[in-house]
Amino acid sequence: MKTLMRHGLAVCLVLTTMCTSLLLVYSSLGSQKERPPQQQQQQQQQQQQAATATGSTQLVESSPQPRRTAPAGPRQLEGYLGVADHKPLKMHCKDCALVTSSGHLLRSQQGPHIDQTECVIRMNDAPTRGYGLDVGNRTSLRVIAHSSIQRILRNRHDLLNVSQGTVFIFWGPSSYMRRDGKGQAYNNLQLLSQVLPRLKAFMITRHRMLQFDELFKQETGKDRKISNTWLSTGWFTMTIALELCDRIDVYGMVPPDFCRDPKHPSVPYHYYEPSGPDECTMYLSHERGRKGSHHRFITEKRVFKNWARTFNIHFFQPDWKPESPAVNHAEGKPVF
């Protein structure tokens, strides 16, 4: 009898517990149904925010730091075609050293500074061997006039060193650069590319040459042909450098009024021809020449001085800066 009573009490206890649990569950469900829709929506938003915050924390802790983007590749320069494949030149430098051929570089000891620059630009057949302490030893780009090609060929073992990966840009009038077999300079370049297939040789197109003429007219107000002017290799080199470089450090270029000073020092026109003509004598004779064609060195330097007021151009050996302009110049590099 006692055993039956204990068994009955146990069953009642179990039933009571189950009923209580069911009532609690029913009450919870009922309370959710009775909540206004706004409260239900707020609860869902709180749950989503909590989940998002948790996920964000995990994402920050597990994700790597963002990587730096790779620098932009070399930009394509229009108007400069490969002699062998006729493909356009692709090149870009943040910092450039434009090394002139001036006698002002003698005993300057600027060579180490020049060689530390990302890209070093030289002109024509200006050598480095024997002058490294003053002009440096590296060459990234060499701009060469058609009249200097023969001298380049004679000194090809020194000047056409393909181990440095130097880029060579040749310029000349269309009669010398024509491709129909009658262009003397172009024929020499074709032969050169066959002898040195690894040479990075480029030529300025005829259309680009006309644009260089137009740029000279825009900057000076003078028509090149009417004024019997031959653009110098320095004109081509400075303009190419503006296309190629973000910053240009020019070594050996005097300001345009340098030769007007009667006390100016006498230096050779070329640092590698110490017994050659005086620099200012050469500049003044070409600037004043009227018969025949001449380089207008001083006129070109006035343009370079104006460009330096706006663009990232700096002059060393001698060191000088252009005075502040009286009027604001339009931003943007010279365009063709």
Swiss-Prot record:
Protein name: Alpha-N-acetylgalactosaminide alpha-2,6-sialyltransferase 5
Single GO BP term: protein glycosylation
Biased composition (Low complexity): 38-49
Positions in the Cytoplasmic compartment: 1-8
Pathway(s) annotated for this protein in UniProt: Glycolipid biosynthesis
Sites carrying sugar chains: N137, N161
InterPro entries: Glyco_trans_29, GT29-like_sf, Sialyl_trans
Segments in the Lumenal topological domain: 30-336
Gene: St6galnac5
Record region (Disordered): 34-76
Location in the cell: Golgi apparatus membrane
Tagged with keyword Transmembrane: yes
Disulfide pairings: C96-C245
Topology relative to the membrane: Single-pass type II membrane protein
Chain intervals with Polar residues compositional bias: 50-66
Alphabetical keyword list: Disulfide bond, Glycoprotein, Glycosyltransferase, Golgi apparatus, Lipid metabolism, Membrane, Sialic acid, Signal-anchor, Transferase, Transmembrane, Transmembrane helix
Organism from which the protein derives: Mus musculus (Mouse)
EC number(s) per entry: 2.4.99.-
Tissue specificity of this protein: High expression in forebrain and to a lesser extent in cerebellum. No expression in salivary gland, intestine, liver, kidney, heart, lung, thymus and spleen.
Membership in a protein family: Belongs to the glycosyltransferase 29 family.
Catalytic activity of the protein: a ganglioside GM1b (d18:1(4E)) + CMP-N-acetyl-beta-neuraminate = a ganglioside GD1alpha (d18:1(4E)) + CMP + H(+); N-acetyl-alpha-neuraminosyl-(2->3)-beta-D-galactosyl-(1->3)-N-acetyl-beta-D-glucosaminyl-(1->3)-beta-D-galactosyl-(1->4)-beta-D-glucosyl-(1<->1')-N-acyl-sphing-4-enine + CMP-N-acetyl-beta-neuraminate = N-acetyl-alpha-neuraminosyl-(2->3)-beta-D-galactosyl-(1->3)-[N-acetyl-alpha-neuraminosyl-(2->6)]-N-acetyl-beta-D-glucosaminyl-(1->3)-beta-D-galactosyl-(1->4)-beta-D-glucosyl-(1<->1')-N-acyl-sphing-4-enine + CMP + H(+)
Task of the protein: Predominantly catalyzes the biosynthesis of ganglioside GD1alpha from GM1b in the brain, by transferring the sialyl group (N-acetyl-alpha-neuraminyl or NeuAc) from CMP-NeuAc to the GalNAc residue on the NeuAc-alpha-2,3-Gal-beta-1,3-GalNAc sequence of GM1b. GD1alpha is a critical molecule in the communication and interaction between neuronal cells and their supportive cells, particularly in brain tissues, and functions as an adhesion molecule in the process of metastasis.
Principal subcellular localization: Golgi
Residue spans crossing the bilayer: 9-29
